[in-house]
């Protein structure tokens, strides 16, 4: 296919050499491409000389050479056909391969479905029809596309039939152009030759004049000089002449000539007047005549701006002639107008040349310079998208009606500045009319433009809370002359800085980040926004990325575990986070935290914030499968507006941050627990629980009244609870850090006791390691170590109630004279008031209700029933006689509403009786020890039975209330048949006990009564009577005599008395213990004693009998 011969300089180097460059002698006699192609079939071409006779061959050599054949841009038509055919073949193979693979898949499905019982289903037939339609459509599209290609080849083939003529036409055109070039070159050389021959021309010789000169020796045609040169003037004469001219000029300027306002700055000297126009020119004029109407003549002229140069040569002559003509016709006013307009035009021309030179440097693609009449336009940042900016420097008429007139009618150079298609004030641009510099003017305008952009960005960035509150530094440097001095400097984090500059030549925003690797995220160029929006967007993105990278780097260094956002349900995050926080977010976990807690770091221009997020506990993350997304339940912002909490990041600060986040998790889980309960008041409110400066975790203040104690956490004793609280209602919960060994959170709870209890704090803290009391004061502190994310409210309430119960028991003991010597939350060890060797202990046994105790602690709102149901037990040492009534005392403790006070009082009341019974039962005898042995049984704390097995006698000892005193009553409970066997003993009992009165006791019907302090004497007298009777019986049996009823008094009474018994034998009614003294109402006490005695008797009878 023949190509196209391009016309013009871009197609060939010169018109005269086109044929020489593409002339091929070997193929000069052939057609293009070696032959003529008709529909793709080439035929051998015939030379024009074929068929001629040999006689004509010689004549052909005299013909001019054939035209040079042009082959530029030609290529064979068969190559194009081969290429199209090959491409069609390749595309067809690809299409068949694709359809074959799809057909194999469809055939496999068809074979499987055909094996079924009913054959191919209708659904499959529909799918197969669709597949076949798609294949046919693809084949049709392929054939259409290929057909279009071959149609193009057909058109080219038909056109190639006339290619021979077109090729010849191209050769003729090239030949004509070559000849035209030769003709023009010949004319050019002839013209140059004619001009050069002017110098070689010589005039014809003047023979007549030459002969006259040779003969006469002179020339008559040459006349001599008719004037004489003046004599040289003396210096004094010159001075006098110049002074005269000065006076003449002064008089003319003062009296006759009109001096325009612009030429009022002049001075006369040296016979001339010098007019000075600042920033424009300085001109010297003088006069040639004394006449007032004589004109001024130009003496000298000088420009007062730089760069400038006076006209030289012919141009200077033209200027001088024009100035003198103007002085003659228009005077000084016309001269000023001429020179003023000339200077203005000259200045614009100088600035234009400077701008053109500047545009040919590195400003070439970003500066457009145009000159319209006398207005110079400099458009800078021409390739920057958005509004255009340019400077116009032109001549202003100076008319008073103009808005920018200076008050005079003199024209002047005016600078107008258009910034982003809007005209703005150009008063701040450095437009120096003395030192002309297009670069300085351009740099000044660009500096002010950059300052405007950066100031707008500065104001936009400073509106963010991160910078307006002083969390990070932001500053700006501005200049009206140098664009490089205009930049915006800000802190992205404590360790990274950002300098924002605008490139002066192109207007592109340049961000210089330290450290520099962060700039790899600044790849997005927003072309549809203004410069300010672009800067704010890029700075916001870089600042957030910088903060995220820095936090992630240090978090990984200290062992935090980052969590990918893809593992968390995005919808759940959208529900609990604001939209601004979702753009830049990092999720972390710590090994010491519960799986349901996360820490989230968000970065924005308003500040960097830390959040704690609680996941849904129904599906703990540790048990989820790898594909299940985590569900965020609630989020808590813990940093608030304070952004300078961490300072410069390093590993130590992140270790402190881990502790602070753990503390905030503890605070939040405790607050959530308190909100679930709803009965405990706390301060501050949840919205104010934020991290404080220096990573201080806020404390929680509780107000826990005894009456408002949550019912589900109240420990209710079956035998009653303290009626008042011994602990102040205000508590403070403070987080103290992480235990390095266990990884548990350390939480301290501070409180105060309501009253001072002697030695309570020292004894309690001695046995409990995680509690401490003030040495001199009522304050105490409780230490808790729990996993991070586990609330301490439930254990705290349990501890407080335990402490309150212990304080209640201790106060009750002290009121009864008992002395505690060891305290713990579950046991109190005490000693008796008078006999220190007798000791006991009261223990508290707490049992949880149900098997879901831990779930109730985590979800207290699911139940309103008390979780803990404690019981109180009492124990005594081996030497203590109260060990026999342990069961009875325990029953009273857990069944009576005032069980503790009643038990302590019973211990004091029963002590003399039990000591005496223990001693009489522990007596040892040498002879017939079994006859004298006495036994007693404690059926309850108020009922005892003394037995003498040898005689089969029984005496019941019971406590009862008489008026306001507790008395012991001894009654004979021996059956009648046994009594009838010992009439003398009955007689003795009647005389010495029933109808008698002893030391602190007196007899009643079939018994005796004694106060609690004197019951030991009554029991001892009874025992002595029984022992003397048995001794008498033993002696009578040895002699064979009947039994005598005379008693024996051979024993000392003092050895059986208890240590605190009064030996004088008087009944001390004033010191007798009373229940009314402790509780104030004797009837109520009697009733309670009887109810307790009945309950204890039933229990003891079952246990013993």
Curated annotation (Swiss-Prot):
GO terms for molecular function: transcription coregulator activity. It is found in: Nucleus. Residues 28-48 are annotated as: Disordered. Its main location: nucleus. The keyword Transcription regulation applies. One of its GO terms (biological process) is regulation of transcription by RNA polymerase II. Component of the Mediator complex. Component of the Mediator complex, a coactivator involved in the regulated transcription of nearly all RNA polymerase II-dependent genes. Mediator functions as a bridge to convey information from gene-specific regulatory proteins to the basal RNA polymerase II transcription machinery. Mediator is recruited to promoters by direct interactions with regulatory proteins and serves as a scaffold for the assembly of a functional preinitiation complex with RNA polymerase II and the general transcription factors. Belongs to the Mediator complex subunit 14 family. PANTHER family: MEDIATOR COMPLEX SUBUNIT, MEDIATOR OF RNA POLYMERASE II TRANSCRIPTION SUBUNIT 14. This is Mediator of RNA polymerase II transcription subunit 14. It comes from Coccidioides immitis (strain RS) (Valley fever fungus). The lineage of its organism: Eukaryota, Fungi, Dikarya, Ascomycota, Pezizomycotina.
């Amino acid at each position: 296919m023949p190509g196209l011969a391009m016309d013009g300089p871009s197609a060939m180097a010169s018109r005269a050499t086109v044929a020489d460059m593409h002339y091929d002698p070997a193929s000069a006699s052939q057609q293009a491409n070696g032959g003529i192609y008709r529909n793709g079939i080439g035929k051998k071409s015939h030379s024009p000389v074929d068929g001629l006779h040999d006689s004509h061959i010689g004549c052909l050599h005299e013909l001019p050479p054939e035209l040079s054949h042009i082959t530029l841009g030609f290529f064979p038509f068969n190559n194009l056909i081969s290429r199209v055919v090959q491409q069609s073949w390749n595309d067809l193979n690809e299409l068949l391969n694709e359809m074959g693979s799809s057909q194999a898949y469809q055939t496999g499905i068809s074979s499987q479905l055909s094996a079924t019982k009913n054959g191919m289903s209708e659904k499959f037939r529909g799918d197969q029809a669709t597949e076949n339609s798609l294949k046919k459509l693809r084949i049709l599209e392929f054939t259409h596309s290929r057909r279009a290609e071959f149609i193009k080849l057909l058109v080219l083939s038909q056109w190639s039939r006339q290619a021979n003529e077109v090729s010849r036409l191209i050769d003729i055109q090239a030949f004509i152009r070559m000849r035209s070039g030769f003709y023009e070159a010949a004319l050019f050389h002839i013209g140059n030759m004619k001009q050069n021959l002017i110098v070689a021309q010589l005039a014809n010789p003047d023979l007549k004049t030459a002969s006259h000169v040779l003969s006469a020796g002179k020339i008559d045609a040459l006349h001599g000089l008719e004037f004489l040169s003046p004599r040289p003037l003396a210096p004094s004469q010159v001075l006098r002449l110049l002074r005269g001219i000065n006076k003449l000029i002064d008089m003319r300027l003062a009296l006759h000539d009109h001096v325009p306002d612009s030429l009022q700055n002049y001075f006369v000297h040296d016979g001339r007047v010098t007019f000075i126009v600042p920033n424009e020119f300085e001109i010297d004029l003088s006069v040639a005549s004394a006449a007032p109407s004589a004109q001024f003549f130009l003496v000298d002229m000088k420009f007062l701006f730089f760069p400038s140069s006076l006209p030289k040569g012919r141009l200077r002559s033209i200027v001088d002639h024009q100035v003198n003509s103007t002085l003659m016709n228009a005077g000084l006013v016309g001269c000023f107008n001429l020179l003023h307009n000339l200077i203005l035009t000259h200045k614009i021309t100088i600035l234009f040349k400077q701008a053109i030179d500047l545009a040919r440097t590195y400003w070439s693609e970003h500066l457009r310079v145009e000159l319209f009449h006398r207005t110079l336009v400099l458009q800078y940042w021409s390739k920057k998208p958005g509004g255009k900016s340019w400077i116009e420097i032109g001549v202003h008429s100076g008319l008073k009606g103009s808005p920018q007139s200076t008050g005079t009618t003199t024209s002047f150079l005016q600078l107008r500045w258009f910034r982003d298609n809007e005209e703005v004030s150009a008063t701040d641009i450095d437009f120096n009319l003395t030192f002309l510099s297009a670069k300085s003017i351009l740099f000044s305008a660009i500096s002010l433009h950059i300052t405007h952009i950066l100031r707008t960005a500065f104001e936009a960035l400073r509106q963010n809370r991160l910078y307006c509150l002083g969390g990070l530094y932001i500053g700006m440097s501005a200049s009206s002359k140098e664009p490089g001095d205009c930049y915006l400097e800000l802190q992205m984090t404590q360790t990274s800085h950002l300098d924002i500059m605008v490139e002066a030549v192109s207007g592109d925003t340049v961000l210089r980040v330290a450290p520099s690797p962060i700039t790899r995220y600044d790849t997005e160029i927003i072309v549809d926004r203004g410069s300010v929006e672009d800067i704010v967007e890029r700075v916001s993105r870089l600042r957030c990325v910088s903060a995220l990278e820095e936090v992630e780097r240090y978090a990984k260094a200290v062992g935090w575990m980052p969590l990918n956002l893809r593992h968390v349900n995005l919808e759940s995050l959208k529900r609990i986070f604001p939209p601004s926080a979702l753009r830049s977010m990092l999720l972390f976990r710590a090994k010491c935290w519960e799986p349901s807690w996360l820490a989230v770091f968000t970065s924005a221009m308003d500040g960097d914030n830390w959040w704690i997020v609680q996941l849904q506990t129904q599906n703990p993350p540790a048990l989820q499968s790898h594909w299940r997304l985590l569900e965020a339940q609630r989020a808590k912002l813990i940093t608030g507006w304070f952004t300078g909490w961490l300072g410069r990041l390093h590993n130590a600060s992140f270790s402190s941050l881990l502790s602070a986040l753990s503390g905030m998790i503890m605070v939040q889980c405790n607050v959530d627990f308190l909100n679930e309960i709803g009965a405990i008041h706390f301060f501050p409110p949840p919205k104010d629980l934020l991290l404080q400066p220096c990573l201080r975790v806020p404390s929680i203040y509780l107000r826990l009244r005894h009456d408002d104690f949550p019912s589900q956490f109240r420990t209710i004793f079956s035998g009653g609870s303290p009626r008042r609280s011994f602990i102040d209602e205000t508590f403070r919960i403070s987080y103290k850090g992480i235990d390095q060994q266990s990884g548990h959170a350390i939480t301290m709870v501070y409180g105060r006791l309501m009253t001072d209890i002697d030695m309570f704090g020292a004894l309690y803290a001695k046995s409990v390691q995680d509690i401490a009391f003030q040495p001199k004061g009522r304050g105490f502190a409780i230490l808790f170590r729990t996993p991070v994310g586990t609330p301490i409210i439930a254990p705290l309430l349990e501890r407080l109630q335990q402490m309150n119960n212990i304080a209640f028991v201790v106060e009750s003991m002290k009121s009864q004279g008992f002395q505690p010597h060891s305290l713990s939350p579950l046991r109190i060890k005490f000693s008796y008031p008078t006999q220190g060797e007798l000791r006991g202990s009261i223990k508290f046994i707490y049992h949880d209700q149900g098997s879901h105790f831990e779930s109730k602690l985590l979800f207290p709102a699911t139940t309103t029933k008390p979780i803990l149901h404690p019981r109180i037990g009492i124990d005594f040492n081996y030497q203590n006689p109260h060990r026999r009534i342990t069961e009875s005392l325990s029953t009273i403790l857990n069944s009576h509403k005032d069980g503790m006070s009643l038990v302590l009082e019973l211990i004091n009341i029963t002590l003399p009786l039990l000591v005496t019974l223990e001693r009489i039962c522990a007596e040892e005898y040498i002879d017939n020890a079994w006859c004298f042995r006495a036994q007693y049984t404690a059926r309850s704390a108020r009922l005892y039975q003394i037995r003498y097995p040898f005689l089969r006698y029984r005496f019941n000892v019971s406590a009862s209330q008489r008026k306001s005193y507790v008395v012991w009553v001894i009654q004979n409970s021996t059956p009648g048949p046994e009594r009838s066997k010992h009439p003398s003993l009955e007689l003795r009992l009647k005389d010495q006990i029933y109808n008698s009165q002893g030391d602190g006791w007196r007899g009643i019907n079939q018994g005796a009564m004694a106060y609690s302090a004197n019951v030991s004497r009554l029991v001892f007298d009874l025992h002595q009577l029984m022992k003397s009777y048995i001794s008498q019986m033993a002696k009578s049996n040895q002699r064979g005599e009947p039994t005598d009823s005379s008693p024996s008094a051979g024993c000392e009474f003092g050895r059986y008395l208890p240590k605190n018994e009064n030996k004088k034998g008087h009944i001390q009614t004033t010191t007798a213990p009373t229940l009314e003294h402790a509780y104030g109402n004797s009837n109520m006490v009697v009733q309670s004693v009887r109810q307790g005695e009945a309950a204890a008797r039933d229990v003891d009878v079952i246990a013993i009998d």
